Structures are given as C-alpha cells and as structure tokens.
A protein has these predicted regions:
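GST-like domain detector, emphasizing the conserved glutathione-binding G-site
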Residues: 3-132, 232
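Glycine-rich, flexible loop segments associated with nucleotide phosphate handling
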Residues: 12, 61-62, 164, 190-196, ...
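C-terminal helix/juxtamembrane-tail motif
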Residues: 2-5, 211-237
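Conserved hydrophobic "DFG−1" position in protein kinase catalytic cores
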Residues: 67-68, 172, 227
Length: 237
C-alpha cells in the first residue's frame, strides 16, 4: 500500500510529522504504509518545526511525532513499534520480539553517528569530519563492521534473526542505506563495497515484495534511490 498524503476534504485519523527526508521517520512511514491505518505523511519545514516546538506540540521537543486519535506519540522507536504492531511486523514469539527490541536499541550508535556534524556550517570541515567517521578507526566504520557481523550471523538473513521481516529490518534498512543516498555530503556510497553481507542484506530487503512495491512509488533518481533493488550495482562496477 502506498503512503497516503492529505487531499482536500479528507481527514486522516493518524498523521506522521517529520522533515521532508527519509531520516528517522522512514521506517515508521513504511510500517504505516503496510498497516491498515488511515494515515497521512506531513512534511515539516524548519520554520514549521520551530512553530510546533514553541506551541508545545512536541512532547520531547523533537520530530518525528505520530498524532493518533488517542494522543501524540513521540520518539522514532516508539512510533515504529506502534506502527509495526499494526502492520504485523512484531513477532508473536516473546523471545524473537525481545531480539527485535535488542537490535533496535543496538542501532543507537549508528543513528547518532552524524549528530555531531549537523551543526557545522563550514562545509569543508563538515565533509572532513564525516569522511573521518568511515576511516579505519572511525565510529562509522566500527558500526558498519558490527552490523555486517550481525547480519552474517543471522540464520534467517533478517536483522534480528527472526523468522520473518520485522520492524528491526525496517529500521536497519532505511537508516543504514539512507546514510549513503547523497543527502549527507561527505559520505560516499562506495563505502559499502567493503561490507558484502550488508549489500546482500540490502538485496534481500529491497526485493521483499511489500518493500519492493512500496518503493516503486518513488523515482530512482530522488532521495530514496538507495531503497531500490539495484541501488548499489553501479558502485560495484
């Protein structure tokens, strides 16, 4: 199911609010699209974000948020778990569900890897610091090696070694490969060539029928090109 956007005279019960980039809301967008919830994707500008923050619309002064008939949910992982439950992407087996939570929590350092570079206005310095993240001793390299090892160890090929795709896969797939979309200057897609297990994982998830169908709605030359099945083939040549 394609994500729904608001149109005239249509009121959706659920609305996801985030900046107009994949980022930390993308996994929840996919989960909502795979659920049966009536929802809309609300893109927030930097000015809109300040207005929301100053008006008290953001429980923790951050985006994304999900507005529901019951109230507002903040924090990307909480939103993902809510949407993932509606989409049937949380295992019923308690152990597997716990391993999904474990994997999501374990991804924290990857999600925060670029945080220290966002406030740097000097583009040359920003690019230099981001490149250093993926040098041999960089934090980015450490995280890629760890994730590559975790994927290689999974007997099922899914992120948390679950029987089926879970919200851990949505988070890993969107946040990891979204880093290499070109949206973050200084981070080259060719970095991934050193991690064959991650490229194999990309192929597995991007070709999963529901994921493949979802991203068919997006052009390959826009910011979500890294989520298409053949995204990194050119890097191999």
């Amino acid at each position: 199911m394609a994500r729904k956007r608001s149109i005239a005279k249509v009121i959706y019960e659920y609305s996801l609010h985030y900046f107009p980039v994949p980022g930390r809301a993308e996994a929840s967008r996919v989960a909502l699209a795979l659920s049966k919830l009536p929802w809309e994707d609300v893109e927030v500008s930097s000015v809109g974000y300040e207005i929301m923050k100053n008006s008290g619309d953001l429980p923790w002064d951050m985006l994304p948020i999900l507005k529901t008939p019951f109230g507002t949910i903040a924090e990307s992982s909480a939103i993902l778990r809510f949407a993932g439950r509606e989409a049937g992407l949380i295992p019923e087996n308690p152990y597997q569900a716990a391993k999904v939570d474990e994997f999501i929590e374990g991804m924290g350092p990857l999600a925060r890897a670029l945080d220290s570079t966002f406030g740097i206005s000097d583009i040359k310095k920003r690019i230099q610091l981001r490149k250093e993240l993926f040098e041999p001793q960089g934090a980015g390299t450490f995280n890629l090696k760890l994730l590559s090892r975790k994927i290689a160890q999974s007997e099922t090929g899914w992120a948390a070694a679950t029987d089926e795709m879970s919200i851990a896969d949505l988070k890993l797939f969107t946040e990891l490969f979204g880093l290499f979309s070109g949206n973050y200057d200084g981070i080259e897609a060719s970095v991934l060539l050193d991690y064959p297990p991650l490229l194999e994982y990309h192929s597995k998830v991007s070709n999963e029928p529901r994921i493949h169908r979802y991203y068919q709605n997006f052009l390959k030359d826009e910011i979500r090109w890294t989520f298409h099945p053949d995204a990194f083939e050119q890097q191999k040549n």
